[in-house]
Protein backbone atom coordinates (compact mmCIF):
# COMPACT_ATOMS: atom_id res chain seq x y z
CA UNK A 1 0.00 0.00 0.00
CA UNK A 2 2.81 2.37 0.91
CA UNK A 3 4.52 1.53 -2.39
CA UNK A 4 1.36 2.34 -4.37
CA UNK A 5 0.90 5.58 -2.42
CA UNK A 6 4.51 6.49 -3.16
CA UNK A 7 4.06 5.98 -6.91
CA UNK A 8 0.86 8.05 -6.89
CA UNK A 9 2.60 10.84 -4.96
CA UNK A 10 5.54 10.81 -7.38
CA UNK A 11 3.18 10.97 -10.36
CA UNK A 12 1.26 13.90 -8.88
CA UNK A 13 4.45 15.80 -8.09
CA UNK A 14 5.86 15.29 -11.59
CA UNK A 15 2.55 16.37 -13.09
CA UNK A 16 2.50 19.55 -11.01
CA UNK A 17 6.09 20.35 -12.01
CA UNK A 18 5.40 19.75 -15.69
CA UNK A 19 2.32 21.97 -15.63
CA UNK A 20 4.28 24.69 -13.85
CA UNK A 21 7.10 24.71 -16.35
CA UNK A 22 7.07 27.05 -19.30
CA UNK A 23 7.72 25.56 -22.69
CA UNK A 24 11.34 25.88 -23.69
CA UNK A 25 12.04 28.22 -26.60
CA UNK A 26 12.84 26.46 -29.86
CA UNK A 27 13.79 29.25 -32.27
CA UNK A 28 15.98 32.30 -32.12
CA UNK A 29 15.09 35.33 -34.21
CA UNK A 30 17.57 38.08 -35.05
CA UNK A 31 15.93 41.12 -36.67
CA UNK A 32 18.28 42.59 -39.26
CA UNK A 33 15.68 45.22 -40.13
CA UNK A 34 12.28 46.07 -38.65
CA UNK A 35 10.92 49.07 -40.59
CA UNK A 36 8.80 49.29 -43.71
CA UNK A 37 10.42 52.28 -45.36
CA UNK A 38 12.65 55.37 -45.48
CA UNK A 39 15.67 54.07 -43.53
CA UNK A 40 17.61 51.84 -45.92
CA UNK A 41 19.74 50.65 -42.97
CA UNK A 42 16.74 49.09 -41.21
CA UNK A 43 14.33 47.40 -43.64
CA UNK A 44 12.47 44.11 -43.29
CA UNK A 45 14.76 41.11 -42.69
CA UNK A 46 14.63 38.46 -39.96
CA UNK A 47 17.10 35.65 -39.30
CA UNK A 48 15.51 32.48 -37.90
CA UNK A 49 17.37 29.40 -36.65
CA UNK A 50 16.80 26.55 -34.21
CA UNK A 51 18.35 27.50 -30.88
CA UNK A 52 21.87 26.17 -30.51
CA UNK A 53 22.62 26.22 -34.24
CA UNK A 54 23.96 28.69 -36.77
CA UNK A 55 21.54 27.48 -39.46
CA UNK A 56 19.75 30.74 -40.21
CA UNK A 57 17.24 31.38 -42.93
CA UNK A 58 16.72 35.06 -43.75
CA UNK A 59 13.03 35.95 -44.06
CA UNK A 60 13.03 38.85 -46.50
CA UNK A 61 16.22 40.79 -47.09
CA UNK A 62 15.57 44.51 -47.21
CA UNK A 63 18.59 45.15 -45.00
CA UNK A 64 21.39 42.62 -44.54
CA UNK A 65 24.88 44.07 -43.92
CA UNK A 66 23.78 47.01 -41.75
CA UNK A 67 21.58 44.66 -39.74
CA UNK A 68 24.43 42.22 -39.16
CA UNK A 69 26.65 45.10 -38.05
CA UNK A 70 23.95 46.25 -35.62
CA UNK A 71 23.63 42.69 -34.27
CA UNK A 72 27.40 42.62 -33.68
CA UNK A 73 27.17 45.99 -31.92
CA UNK A 74 24.38 44.63 -29.69
CA UNK A 75 26.42 41.55 -28.79
CA UNK A 76 24.18 39.11 -30.65
CA UNK A 77 27.08 37.96 -32.85
CA UNK A 78 30.76 37.88 -31.87
CA UNK A 79 32.17 37.05 -35.31
CA UNK A 80 32.92 39.28 -38.32
CA UNK A 81 29.94 40.32 -40.43
CA UNK A 82 31.35 38.34 -43.36
CA UNK A 83 31.08 35.15 -41.30
CA UNK A 84 27.41 35.77 -40.57
CA UNK A 85 26.71 36.58 -44.22
CA UNK A 86 28.68 33.77 -45.80
CA UNK A 87 28.45 30.99 -43.21
CA UNK A 88 25.53 31.55 -40.85
CA UNK A 89 22.88 32.58 -43.39
CA UNK A 90 21.98 29.41 -45.28
CA UNK A 91 19.30 30.85 -47.55
CA UNK A 92 16.67 33.53 -48.15
CA UNK A 93 12.87 33.37 -48.25
CA UNK A 94 11.57 36.39 -50.14
CA UNK A 95 7.89 37.20 -49.58
CA UNK A 96 7.65 39.57 -52.55
CA UNK A 97 10.10 41.50 -54.67
CA UNK A 98 9.50 45.09 -53.61
CA UNK A 99 12.82 46.81 -52.99
CA UNK A 100 12.35 47.24 -49.25
CA UNK A 101 12.33 43.43 -49.05
CA UNK A 102 15.12 42.52 -51.48
CA UNK A 103 17.61 45.40 -51.64
CA UNK A 104 19.93 43.84 -49.05
CA UNK A 105 19.98 40.57 -50.97
CA UNK A 106 20.88 42.36 -54.20
CA UNK A 107 23.55 44.68 -52.81
CA UNK A 108 25.26 41.95 -50.76
CA UNK A 109 25.21 39.30 -53.49
CA UNK A 110 28.81 39.91 -54.71
CA UNK A 111 30.14 39.23 -51.19
CA UNK A 112 27.77 36.36 -50.41
CA UNK A 113 28.37 32.61 -50.63
CA UNK A 114 26.51 29.93 -52.58
CA UNK A 115 23.01 29.37 -51.21
CA UNK A 116 19.33 29.10 -52.14
CA UNK A 117 16.79 31.88 -52.63
CA UNK A 118 13.18 30.75 -52.13
CA UNK A 119 10.17 32.64 -53.51
CA UNK A 120 6.84 32.07 -55.20
CA UNK A 121 6.75 32.38 -58.99
CA UNK A 122 5.70 36.07 -59.33
CA UNK A 123 8.42 37.24 -56.92
CA UNK A 124 11.03 35.01 -58.53
CA UNK A 125 10.17 36.28 -62.01
CA UNK A 126 10.42 39.88 -60.87
CA UNK A 127 13.85 39.29 -59.34
CA UNK A 128 15.07 37.50 -62.47
CA UNK A 129 13.61 39.92 -65.00
CA UNK A 130 14.18 43.24 -63.25
CA UNK A 131 17.06 42.84 -60.78
CA UNK A 132 19.34 39.87 -61.49
CA UNK A 133 19.23 40.41 -65.25
CA UNK A 134 22.80 41.48 -66.18
CA UNK A 135 21.55 45.05 -66.65
CA UNK A 136 20.17 46.34 -63.37
CA UNK A 137 22.57 43.95 -61.58
CA UNK A 138 24.66 40.92 -62.43
CA UNK A 139 22.71 37.67 -62.58
CA UNK A 140 23.97 35.85 -59.50
CA UNK A 141 21.31 33.18 -59.99
CA UNK A 142 21.38 29.88 -61.84
CA UNK A 143 18.73 30.79 -64.41
CA UNK A 144 17.24 33.84 -66.09
CA UNK A 145 18.58 36.60 -68.33
CA UNK A 146 22.18 37.27 -69.32
CA UNK A 147 24.93 34.99 -68.05
CA UNK A 148 23.91 33.28 -64.79
CA UNK A 149 26.84 33.23 -62.35
CA UNK A 150 25.21 30.37 -60.41
CA UNK A 151 26.00 31.68 -56.94
CA UNK A 152 22.36 31.52 -55.92
CA UNK A 153 20.03 28.64 -56.66
CA UNK A 154 16.58 30.05 -57.40
CA UNK A 155 13.96 27.72 -55.87
CA UNK A 156 10.38 28.52 -56.86
CA UNK A 157 7.88 27.63 -54.16
CA UNK A 158 4.43 26.15 -54.69
CA UNK A 159 1.64 26.91 -52.25
CA UNK A 160 0.75 24.22 -49.71
CA UNK A 161 3.89 22.19 -50.46
CA UNK A 162 6.47 21.81 -47.70
CA UNK A 163 10.12 21.59 -48.72
CA UNK A 164 13.38 21.41 -46.75
CA UNK A 165 15.50 24.54 -46.41
CA UNK A 166 18.92 23.55 -47.72
CA UNK A 167 21.73 23.15 -45.17
CA UNK A 168 19.34 23.49 -42.22
CA UNK A 169 17.06 21.21 -40.22
CA UNK A 170 14.04 23.40 -41.04
CA UNK A 171 11.31 23.28 -43.66
CA UNK A 172 9.24 26.00 -45.34
CA UNK A 173 5.67 26.11 -46.59
CA UNK A 174 4.34 29.11 -48.53
CA UNK A 175 0.85 30.61 -48.29
CA UNK A 176 -0.61 33.36 -50.52
CA UNK A 177 -1.18 36.90 -49.29
CA UNK A 178 -2.69 39.89 -51.07
CA UNK A 179 -0.65 43.09 -51.23
CA UNK A 180 -2.94 45.35 -53.30
CA UNK A 181 -5.00 42.73 -55.10
CA UNK A 182 -4.05 41.05 -57.46
CA UNK A 183 -0.37 41.53 -56.46
CA UNK A 184 0.74 38.54 -54.42
CA UNK A 185 2.86 38.43 -51.31
CA UNK A 186 3.72 35.39 -49.20
CA UNK A 187 3.51 33.99 -45.70
CA UNK A 188 6.16 31.44 -44.72
CA UNK A 189 5.55 28.68 -42.19
CA UNK A 190 8.99 27.67 -40.93
CA UNK A 191 9.11 24.34 -39.10
CA UNK A 192 11.63 22.47 -37.00
CA UNK A 193 10.23 19.03 -36.14
CA UNK A 194 6.84 19.75 -34.50
CA UNK A 195 7.53 23.42 -33.79
CA UNK A 196 6.93 26.37 -36.09
CA UNK A 197 7.14 30.11 -36.70
CA UNK A 198 4.85 31.99 -39.09
CA UNK A 199 6.22 35.02 -40.96
CA UNK A 200 3.92 37.17 -43.08
CA UNK A 201 5.22 39.47 -45.76
CA UNK A 202 3.27 42.60 -46.63
CA UNK A 203 -0.48 42.04 -46.56
CA UNK A 204 -3.69 43.97 -46.53
CA UNK A 205 -6.76 42.84 -44.57
CA UNK A 206 -9.19 40.50 -46.27
CA UNK A 207 -11.97 43.08 -45.97
CA UNK A 208 -10.03 45.63 -48.03
CA UNK A 209 -8.25 43.25 -50.39
CA UNK A 210 -11.51 41.37 -51.12
CA UNK A 211 -9.85 37.99 -50.67
CA UNK A 212 -9.96 35.16 -48.14
CA UNK A 213 -6.18 34.70 -48.05
CA UNK A 214 -5.76 35.60 -44.39
CA UNK A 215 -8.82 33.64 -43.28
CA UNK A 216 -7.52 30.61 -45.16
CA UNK A 217 -4.11 31.05 -43.53
CA UNK A 218 -5.61 31.34 -40.04
CA UNK A 219 -7.63 28.19 -40.57
CA UNK A 220 -4.52 26.32 -41.73
CA UNK A 221 -2.36 27.28 -38.74
CA UNK A 222 -5.04 27.09 -36.05
CA UNK A 223 -4.27 23.46 -35.10
CA UNK A 224 -0.62 24.41 -34.49
CA UNK A 225 -1.70 27.15 -32.10
CA UNK A 226 -4.11 24.87 -30.28
CA UNK A 227 -1.30 22.35 -29.76
CA UNK A 228 1.12 25.17 -28.74
CA UNK A 229 3.43 24.21 -31.60
CA UNK A 230 3.36 27.64 -33.25
CA UNK A 231 5.84 29.69 -31.24
CA UNK A 232 5.20 33.07 -32.81
CA UNK A 233 3.56 35.04 -35.61
CA UNK A 234 5.52 37.84 -37.26
CA UNK A 235 2.96 40.11 -38.90
CA UNK A 236 3.06 43.62 -40.28
CA UNK A 237 1.35 46.78 -39.06
CA UNK A 238 2.44 49.63 -41.30
CA UNK A 239 0.13 52.54 -40.46
CA UNK A 240 -1.81 53.89 -37.46
CA UNK A 241 -5.59 53.64 -37.40
CA UNK A 242 -6.00 57.11 -38.89
CA UNK A 243 -4.84 55.83 -42.30
CA UNK A 244 -7.89 55.55 -44.59
CA UNK A 245 -8.61 52.15 -46.13
CA UNK A 246 -8.28 53.69 -49.59
CA UNK A 247 -4.64 54.52 -48.80
CA UNK A 248 -3.50 51.34 -47.07
CA UNK A 249 -1.66 50.16 -50.22
CA UNK A 250 -1.90 46.54 -49.12
CA UNK A 251 -0.97 46.99 -45.47
CA UNK A 252 -2.49 46.63 -41.99
CA UNK A 253 -3.38 49.07 -39.22
CA UNK A 254 -3.86 48.14 -35.54
CA UNK A 255 -7.64 47.95 -35.92
CA UNK A 256 -7.37 45.74 -39.00
CA UNK A 257 -4.84 43.52 -37.23
CA UNK A 258 -7.25 43.08 -34.32
CA UNK A 259 -10.06 42.17 -36.71
CA UNK A 260 -7.82 39.52 -38.26
CA UNK A 261 -6.85 38.26 -34.80
CA UNK A 262 -10.56 37.91 -34.01
CA UNK A 263 -10.91 35.68 -37.06
CA UNK A 264 -7.90 33.64 -35.95
CA UNK A 265 -9.24 33.37 -32.39
CA UNK A 266 -12.51 32.00 -33.74
CA UNK A 267 -10.51 29.04 -35.06
CA UNK A 268 -8.17 28.62 -32.08
CA UNK A 269 -10.00 29.90 -29.01
CA UNK A 270 -8.81 32.94 -27.05
CA UNK A 271 -6.72 31.09 -24.47
CA UNK A 272 -4.73 29.18 -27.05
CA UNK A 273 -4.02 32.33 -29.06
CA UNK A 274 -2.83 34.17 -25.94
CA UNK A 275 0.03 31.67 -25.65
CA UNK A 276 1.34 32.50 -29.14
CA UNK A 277 3.60 35.56 -29.36
CA UNK A 278 2.57 38.19 -31.91
CA UNK A 279 5.60 40.10 -33.22
CA UNK A 280 4.87 43.33 -35.08
CA UNK A 281 6.90 44.03 -38.22
CA UNK A 282 7.12 46.59 -41.03
CA UNK A 283 6.41 49.73 -38.99
CA UNK A 284 6.59 52.72 -41.30
CA UNK A 285 8.35 55.91 -40.16
CA UNK A 286 8.13 58.76 -39.19
CA UNK A 287 8.72 58.16 -35.50
CA UNK A 288 5.44 59.83 -34.52
CA UNK A 289 3.47 57.33 -36.62
CA UNK A 290 5.38 54.40 -35.12
CA UNK A 291 4.71 55.67 -31.60
CA UNK A 292 1.02 56.00 -32.39
CA UNK A 293 0.90 52.41 -33.72
CA UNK A 294 2.52 51.16 -30.51
CA UNK A 295 0.07 53.13 -28.36
CA UNK A 296 -2.90 51.82 -30.30
CA UNK A 297 -1.71 48.22 -29.99
CA UNK A 298 -0.92 48.71 -26.28
CA UNK A 299 -4.57 49.51 -25.56
CA UNK A 300 -6.45 46.66 -23.83
CA UNK A 301 -8.11 44.26 -26.24
CA UNK A 302 -10.82 41.68 -25.61
CA UNK A 303 -8.53 38.89 -26.81
CA UNK A 304 -5.97 39.59 -24.10
CA UNK A 305 -3.14 39.68 -26.62
CA UNK A 306 0.23 41.27 -25.93
CA UNK A 307 2.31 42.45 -28.86
CA UNK A 308 6.09 42.35 -29.20
CA UNK A 309 8.05 45.04 -31.05
CA UNK A 310 11.42 43.70 -32.25
CA UNK A 311 14.57 45.81 -32.12
CA UNK A 312 17.16 45.69 -34.88
CA UNK A 313 20.05 43.43 -33.95
CA UNK A 314 18.55 42.21 -30.66
CA UNK A 315 18.10 38.44 -30.42
CA UNK A 316 14.70 37.01 -29.44
CA UNK A 317 13.77 33.48 -28.42
CA UNK A 318 10.46 31.84 -29.31
Listing of model-derived features with the role each one plays in the protein:
Residues 29, 46, 60, 96, ...:
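Divalent metal-coordination and catalytic microenvironments
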Residues 79-148:
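Active-site HxH/HxHxD metal-binding segment of metal-dependent hydrolases
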Residues 2, 9, 16-56, 63-65:
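Zn-dependent metallo-beta-lactamase
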Residues 206-311:
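Cap/insert and terminal regions of metallo-dependent hydrolase folds
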Residues 45, 49, 156-226:
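Catalytic core of the metallo-beta-lactamase
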Residues 58-62, 88-100, 118-120, 199-202, ...:
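Active-site neighborhood of phospho(di)ester-bond hydrolases with catalytic His/Asp-centered motifs
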Residues 22-26, 122-185, 302-317:
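Metallo-beta-lactamase
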Residues 38-93, 103-110, 209, 213-221:
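Pre-active-site segment of Zn-dependent metallo-hydrolases
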Amino acid sequence: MRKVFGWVLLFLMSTIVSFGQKAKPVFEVVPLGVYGGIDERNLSAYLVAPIGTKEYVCLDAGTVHSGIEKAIEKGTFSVPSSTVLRQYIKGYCISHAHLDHVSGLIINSPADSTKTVYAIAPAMKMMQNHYFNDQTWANFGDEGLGKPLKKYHFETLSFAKTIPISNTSMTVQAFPLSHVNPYESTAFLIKKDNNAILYLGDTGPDSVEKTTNLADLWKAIAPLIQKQELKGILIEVSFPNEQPDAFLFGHLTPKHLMKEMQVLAAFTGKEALQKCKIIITHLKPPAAAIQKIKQQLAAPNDLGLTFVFPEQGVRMEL
